Structure formats: C-alpha cells, structure tokens
Design a protein with these regions (language model features):
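Conserved strand-to-loop turn within each blade of WD40 beta-propeller repeats
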Residues: 72-75, 126-129, 166-169, 216-219, ...
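Short coil/turn linkers that define WD40 beta-propeller blade boundaries
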Residues: 86-87, 140-141, 180-183, 230, ...
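WD40/WD-repeat beta-propeller blade N-cap
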Residues: 50-57, 93-101, 107, 146-153, ...
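WD40-repeat beta-propellers
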Residues: 78-81, 132-136, 172-177, 222-226, ...
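Loop/turn segments within WD40 beta-propeller blades
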Residues: 61-66, 104-120, 156-161, 200-210, ...
Length: 764
C-alpha cells in the first residue's frame, strides 16, 4: 500500500512526559535471559466464515479548515474522519428510513479555535425519503429536520446558511438552517416538468448582491436562476435528441463556465454567460456522477468520474480559453459515487468499493511523468471497517472448554455464532433483532462472559436478552430507557455497565433485580467518546474523548480521574490486568503506558518522549491500530486492518522494524485480473439480476470451516510488523496459548459487489 505524508505528532504538554532522554536500563542478566529465551508460539484459530461487508460510500464532504471529512454510506450510516491522521472519530448508524444521498459539514462562525471540535461543526444529510436532517453528534439521532413537500431530495448544496435542494417534483427550493430550530422554507421557484437531479450555486469571483444558481434535470435540460427574483434566466437543452438523458452533477467555475455530467458519460462544458456549449468530453462509457473543481480562479481545472470509475482531469488553457484533457487514472475498480478535493495535493474518491481512495496529485494532474515511468499515480486506500469493535466473545460455555460464543453486531441486528476450538469450525446459531418497529439502527452490543446474556442499544433504548444454548432460544427480558454507546458485563454477569455520551453518565444495572443500581456522572461538558475499555477484575472503565481527554472511572468508589496523555487524539485504550496498567495508543500510533495506582506514566513511557524513539518505519506506518491483545504483563500485540505488531516492554526498541510479508498460500493468493474480468462479465450480462447476485453471495459465505494458518510466533524481534492475515476484525486470547483471529476475506467481498453498469433506474 502506498503512502501519503502525515503531520508530525504533537508533543505532550504533560510534565510527566518531560523526563530524562536516557533509556531505562536492562541489566545483563535480563539481556542474557532474553537471548536464551526460546521462541514460543500461540496456537491460532482463524475465523473467516462470518461475513462483514461494508456499505458503499454515497457522498464525501471535506472541511479542510478543520482537517476533517464526513461521508455517508448506502446503509444510512454516517462517519467523520480526521484527514491528517485518518482516525474515524465519529460513526453512528443512522436511521433505516433515512437513506442518505448527500452529507454536508458546516463550520460554525465566531467559535474560538480552542473550542472542542463538537462545538465547531454542524452535520446535515438529505436523502430519497425527502428529509433534510441536522444530526446531533452526541445522541447520534436527528436533531432538526425539514420535510420536502416535493418528495425525494436528489442533491443539496449550501451557501452560508441557505441550502438549495433538488426536488423530485421539479421545483427548486431554498431552505434556511438556523442554530436551534428546524430548517424552514424561504423560497420556492417555478416548477418544471422534469425531476431535478442536481443543483449548484454559481461560483463567482466578483462580489455581487445577485446570487445565481443552476438546476440539472432528468430530461437533460439545465436552468440558470436568479435567486433574489426567482426568474429563470436561461434554459439549455441537451444537445442530444435523447430525452432520457439525466444531468447527475454540475460544477460552476469563475462565473463563466458550467460543467455538467450526464448519464451518457459525457462532460459538457458551457459558457453560461452566452448559453453556448464550448466543449464536450466523452471519456466514460457510463454515467458521470461527480465533478469537483480545484477552486483556483487563475488556473481553473476540474475532476470528474462516475459509474465508469476512470477519474479524468480537465483544465482551462487561459491563453486560448480552451478546455483540454490533461490526465486520467483508474484508482478504484468499481463505481465512484463521490469526489472531494482535500487540498491541492490530494483528491479523495469513494463508491462501491467502500473504502476511501486518496489519489496523489502532481501539479493538479492524476499522474507524474518520470524519465522511465509514465502514468504513475501514488494512491492509498483507507479501510472502510469501523474502528469500534463489532465482535464480542464469551468464555467457554461448556465444561469441556471446546466451545465459545461470538456475537457479531451488524447494522440492524446481531448474529450469534458458536466456535469449536478443536475442529476450528464456526456455526451460525441465531439472529438477535431489536424492536423491528423502531427506525433506528444498532449503536452498540455485547455478550456476557458466561454467554447467557446479550444486550444491544438503539435509539434511546438498551434491550436485555437471555440466551439458552441447549434450546438455542433467545428471549427479551427488559428494555432500559437509556442509550448506550458502550456496553459491558461484569465477570460474574451480575451487573451491566452502560456508558452513554448523550447523558454523559454510566448506568450500572443489577441483572437479577432488573433495575439501575447507580448513575455515575461523567465530565460536566458532554463529549464524543472515541474509544473505551473495561477492566473485568476491578469493574473500572477508561475512555478517551473528542476533546483529547482521557478518564478513568472507579465504579466502586464512584470516582473519576484524569489520565495522563499526550495532546492529541487517543484512538485505542486497553487495560493490562496482568500488571495493572493502562495502554494508550494515540492517533500517530505512538504508545503510552500508565500505571493505574499512581496515575503516572511508567518508566518505559517517560523514556520515550519523541517519535524518534520508536522504529523509523513504524513511525511512518499509516495503518491505524484497531485493537490491542494482551499476551503477558510485558508483551502485547497491536493489530491493524492488515497486520499485527509484537511489543515487548523488556526489550530495546529497534531503529527499524522488521517486516514479515504474507507468504500467500493457495487460499489467500488472488488473481485480481481474473476476479475483475469475471466481475465485468457479470455486469454486462443482462440476465445478471438480483436473484443471481443473491445466489453468488450465499455461495461465498455458506462455508463454516475456517482457514488454517501457521501459529503466531513470538520471537525475539521486537516491533516486528507481520502481515499474515486478511482484514483483521478481532484478535483475542481465548486461553493462555490460543489466539483467535476473526478476519474478512476481501476477495469474497469484491466478488459480491453489485455490477456498476446495471445502475438501478433513478427514483427506485
């Protein structure tokens, strides 16, 4: 995977981080014993039969001023990412009925730079159900909404606090969004005979009181409007005689040019002042779905793509006022639904392949010409999988210690599986549904250590279920009127701990009495919880927030203490009960270890005050830590979506990490050209419809036997980066010598992607 530059880590402001530069000594006896210590292995169980397919990206919206972006997916979920370190800071499941098409981040004005991020932004979406929604970042639920009387909203575009919406009934509408109330209609324009599929404000380089905007229609026409008077200033008919041409996307440049992408794969460039088509590009074989401008009035250019995933770059030659094609590149294999320009160096794309693709630009072009290599583009893919854990394990549920339960949280239900560790086979048991009448998707879930209790949270409810393994029977016991972002059970399953960022409280539930025993208030300022962990021995909770704070909750004493931490996001937290410490991973993958009794950094941490104290290639490593697996008091594994790293606190850190690449066996090795060729054969076959697609998916995931893999070797190479698995969803110890790895096979996922060319008819 190719890499893009990342910002340097912020230095900690904490005084405890400012200790001596000298490394903690390791005595000769310890060194000798370390060298003599034989390599030992962990028996590895590898689960690959549990399907976890991410949803396609519908739209991406960047906010460069705050180094964040928002994206929405086809399953209605919404995510916010940092764009300098690529941490998924917010993800909430959305509502089933709010199938989103567009997302927008609004940067509030007159907010101090020192204010928390949550106070600086507002998040809006629109979709085919006809609602414009502002979301509460704390509750993960709609905060305010506007119901469009014209039905489906195909597109929206903001200018200050005014939102233009593309209505299904052909009527352009303008909605005002206020700070603490529902959006409301301020203007309604003349209705047309065709649906409006795209809207666009005029991008003017001259300040004027007159605001202009454009609408693209389902019959191929384009209209220019005066916002103040409501008059139609210009109507352009599509040059083709085909009335079924759809104008999916538009982009205004310098008050003079309007770029339009249509369903035939053409990019139309109009001189909008005279209503003249000045250029036509036919680089695509299917619909153009997204156009984005570089925003430079002196050297205008634009990027466009769509169902045919080729990304093209066109520029205006200012000497002769002619638009020319300068570069093109295919960075993703399937449909691209959205482009967004991060800055002059990076172009983002997202679509059917579910990941965020970062394309490196060279002077605005998609590739750089070298002396020996031409058409070379540096790109990087950001994994689509949620950073929050979605797989939960029970202890052994039988005296023979052969079987454990696995709870898999999906979008609107949970799957329960059983794993036999002797045969390494996983068997599907049951589905756990929330209240089907409720429109919300599942926010969090967990299973008790004994496997007899399951909880899941949605909307403002957390439901408790019992599970009888002998009868394979699930019963709902009670609904608690509390929203839970994280759920934990005590080791004896007598209590449940619900952590809610909406109310900023921890609710302790007595399982036998089915009532709330305690409510522990968190910090006064409500905040987004980035990551959280639970100590099964002390019932303590540790969590980090979006405002870059870390807290430790003693649920017995009902005390909350601040944990020492660097001045940056803490993306992962883990209790190490073997030595009573807390492991913190920051957004740059640097490691901090806190001694819990003293609430101070350990000597191992205070001796490493700079990024230069860590291996060079580890510091430059861009995969983010998804989880931490404790092996012993001094050894733990860090795992990402692609690989894992062994950390041994008793050994010196190498100057450079060894990298062990995957020795691909027959199962893992993939002929990507064959996969893509088969895919394109399917999508051009008119008989390849939903029924066939379902059959292929079922064939893919029907097998319950899991792949065999060599045991994980814990040798003397500290900080070794190992690539042995496919996408890692979970790594956890199920006994002293056995490691469980839940992974996704990306090849299976690719084969189940829907065909790009068989785009569903609009309106469906």
């Amino acid at each position: 995977m190719n890499k893009t530059p990342s910002k340097k880590s912020n230095k900690s402001n904490n005084s405890s981080r400012k200790s001596s530069k000298s490394k903690s000594p390791i005595n000769k006896e310890q060194q000798s014993s370390t060298k003599q210590k034989a390599t030992f292995e962990l028996s590895t169980l590898r689960i690959n039969s549990i399907e976890n397919t991410p949803s396609p990206i519908e739209h991406i919206c960047c906010l460069p001023s705050l180094s964040i972006l928002a994206l929405c997916r086809s399953d209605s979920s919404i995510e916010i990412w940092t764009t300098n370190t690529w941490i998924q800071v917010i993800k909430f499941p959305g509502l089933k009925s709010l199938q989103t098409r567009r997302v927008f981040l609004y940067h509030k004005k007159n907010v101090p730079d020192s204010a928390p991020l949550i106070n600086k932004i507002r998040l809006f979406t629109c979709g085919i159900n006809g609602y414009l929604v502002e979301w509460s970042l704390l509750s993960n639920l709609p905060k305010f909404s506007y119901k469009n009387p014209g039905g489906c909203i195909w597109d929206m575009q903001f200018k200050d606090k005014i939102c233009l919406i593309a209505s299904n009934d052909g009527t352009p509408r303008a909605v005002k969004v206020k700070k603490s109330s529902n959006p409301y209609l301020i203007k309604q324009f003349a209705k047309s005979d065709s649906r409006i599929l795209s809207v666009c404000w005029e991008n003017s380089t001259i300040k004027t009181k007159t605001r202009l905007f454009y609408t693209g229609h389902s019959n191929g026409t384009i209209c220019k409007w005066n916002f103040e008077t409501g008059q139609t200033l210009l109507t352009l008919s599509n040059p083709s005689a085909d009335n079924d041409i759809l104008i999916w996307t538009m982009c205004s440049i310098n008050s003079k040019y309007l770029l339009c992408g249509d369903s035939t794969g053409k990019l139309l460039v109009y001189d909008i002042n005279f209503g003249v088509l000045v250029k036509e590009f036919k680089e695509h074989t299917a619909d153009i779905l997204s156009i984005v401008s570089n925003g430079n009035p002196n050297e205008p250019s634009a990027y466009f793509t769509g169902i045919d995933s080729l990304i093209c770059n066109v520029k205006l030659n200012t000497k002769n006022n002619e638009w020319i094609l300068t570069s093109s590149f295919r960075g993703q294999s399937h449909d691209i639904n959205s482009l967004s320009l991060l800055n002059e160096n990076y172009l983002l794309s997202g679509g059917i392949t579910t990941d965020i693709c970062i394309n490196h630009l060279y002077n605005g072009n998609m590739y750089q010409k070298y002396e020996k290599k031409i058409n070379t583009n540096v790109k990087r893919h950001i994994s689509p999988f949620e950073h929050k854990q979605n797989y939960y394990l029970s202890d052994f549920i039988d005296s023979s210690k052969k079987n454990i339960l696995i709870l898999h949280k999906k979008h609107d239900y949970c799957d329960l599986w059983i794993l036999n560790i002797n045969s390494n086979t996983s068997t599907y048991l049951a589905k756990i549904y929330k209240n089907k009448k409720n429109d919300s998707n599942i926010l969090s879930a967990n299973i008790s250590r004994d496997g007899k209790l399951i909880m899941l949270s949605y909307d403002d409810i957390t439901s408790l279920f019992s599970y009888d393994y002998d009868k394979n029977e699930i019963k709902k016991i009670k609904e608690f009127k509390h929203q839970s972002n994280y759920i934990f059970f005590s080791s004896d399953s007598s209590k449940a701990y619900l952590l809610s960022q909406k109310t900023s409280k921890v609710y302790i539930i007595d399982i036998n009495a089915l009532k709330v025993l305690k409510e522990i208030s968190l910090n006064k300022d409500k905040d987004i919880i980035l990551t959280c962990d639970f100590n099964y021995e002390s019932n303590a909770i540790a969590y980090s927030t979006l405002s870059k704070q870390v807290y430790y909750i003693d649920t017995v004493k009902e005390e909350i203490n601040s944990v020492p931490h660097p001045d940056c996001f803490i993306s992962k937290i883990k209790f190490n009960t073997k030595n009573n410490t807390l492991i913190l991973i920051d957004e740059y993958n640097l490691i901090y270890i806190v001694d819990i009794p003293t609430m101070k950094f350990t000597q191992w941490t205070t001796d490493r005050i700079e990024k230069t104290d860590f291996p060079i290639n580890y510091v430059k490593w861009y995969n983010k830590i998804y989880g931490i697996t404790i092996i012993s008091k001094d050894v733990f594994l860090l795992y990402t979506d692609y690989n894992y790293i062994k950390v041994d606190l008793t050994k010196q850190l190498p100057k450079e990490s060894l990298i062990e690449k995957n020795k691909m066996d027959k199962y893992v090795k993939s002929d990507w050209e064959k996969i893509i060729k088969e895919f394109h054969q399917k999508i051009f076959d008119e008989e390849y419809k939903g029924k066939e697609y379902s059959k292929i998916r079922n064939d893919m995931f029907s097998s319950t036997s899991n792949k065999k893999v060599p045991d994980i070797s814990l040798d003397n190479d500290n900080f070794k980066i190992v690539s042995k698995f496919n996408s890692i969803m979970l790594m956890d110890m199920i006994n002293e010598n056995t490691m469980l790895v839940v992974e996704n096979d990306w090849n299976k996922i690719v084969k189940t992607f829907p065909g790009g060319v068989i785009k569903p008819n609009y309106g469906h």
